[in-house]
Amino acid sequence: GDIQGVNHGLASLLQLIMTAKDAQLPVLTIQDKPAFGYRGLMLDCARHFWTVDELKETLDHMAFFKLNTLHMHLTDNQAWRLSMDKYPDLVKEGTYYYDFPELSGKYYSKEDLKEIVTYAGTRGIEIIPEVDLPGHCIACRIA
């Protein structure tokens, strides 16, 4: 066992306690292992921006349910959410919503992504960033 196995064991124990009558558990032996290596979800951060705090809360929930992969869809026709030093207009122009200006200008800096990856890593979760090219690139072309 590694630390992730310990974390998963503690999550199983907490889940049992939460559902046990009067928080009492019988003496038991648990044999638990995942059926699949990839246990994750995908968030469309391009069309529906998630703040760093919202992502951290999601990562906490993922860890509780023993998920190990978060696929972040960072670019699409509607917005480019990935800051790139060489192309600053991608987040300046590529995040503008003409129909919903209050959603405009939101993106992830390099520091944001480092923070998210580090936070996820401490919970045994891998981040898969997705840049949707060559299709779905209207936001990129606008910038």
Per-segment meaning from a language model:
Residues G1-A143:
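Feature activates predominantly on carbohydrate-active enzymes
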